[in-house]
Amino acid sequence: MNKFKTKIAVLAISFLSFAGIQSASAIEGLTIGAALNYSGFGGTGTETKDVAGTDEIVSEHGVFDADYASLFVEYAFSDAFSLGIERHLDDITTPTNTNTKNQSDNTVKATFENHTTLYANINMPFNTYFKLGVIAVDVATQENLNTGGSYNNVDTTGLTVGLGYNLTMDNGVFVRAEISGSDYDDVSATNQSPDGNAQEVKVTDMIGVTAAIKVGKSF
């Protein structure tokens, strides 16, 4: 995963450096902007606990929504194709899941941090465009367990596809409306509690649907 993030960073720096070549004409094709996003997320969580050599398995599907801001920068290599990188400004935190056992509440939630997307926009007729990208995100767990244990933080990757409409003014200022869907790789975290009983949590079938309004300027 760290190698994947490094590759994204290298690609991002490479195309931004290319866009920033020391000549005024190099600014042409550069786009910067901000977005307001509203997303719905879903996934299936499965907890497996090893109790005296016997697995206790609990599985549950959940959904939640979130709104957040993001910034993006793009470079147009032609009238039809541009490459961009987008970074969430806000972390996304799941609702807290509470499980009462032995008259004690166990609470677990997760926060998606450093959500970064490297993407390509392909322009189509009637001011529309098709978006295809790859995602890298960190998943930090926050738990309060009666065993005193804790889960490790993890990270994951994903793919996103979307469609958008772009309206550009004469001065290069633009407004976009975009809808996209994302699919994330499965993740798992392990908790070795002081009582010696190992627990594993897997989150599978993670998906997201996002509607966004974007504003910016193209040079």
Task: Cite the ranges covered by each PLM segment.
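Cleavable N-terminal export/targeting peptides
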Residues: 1-29, 219
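Surface-exposed strand-loop-strand hairpins of Gram-negative outer-membrane beta-barrel proteins
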Residues: 39-68, 151-157
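Disordered low-complexity repeat/linker domains
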Residues: 47-56, 98-106, 145-149, 191-198
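Predominantly the C-terminal beta-signal and adjacent terminal strand-loop region
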Residues: 55-57, 90-95, 159, 167-219
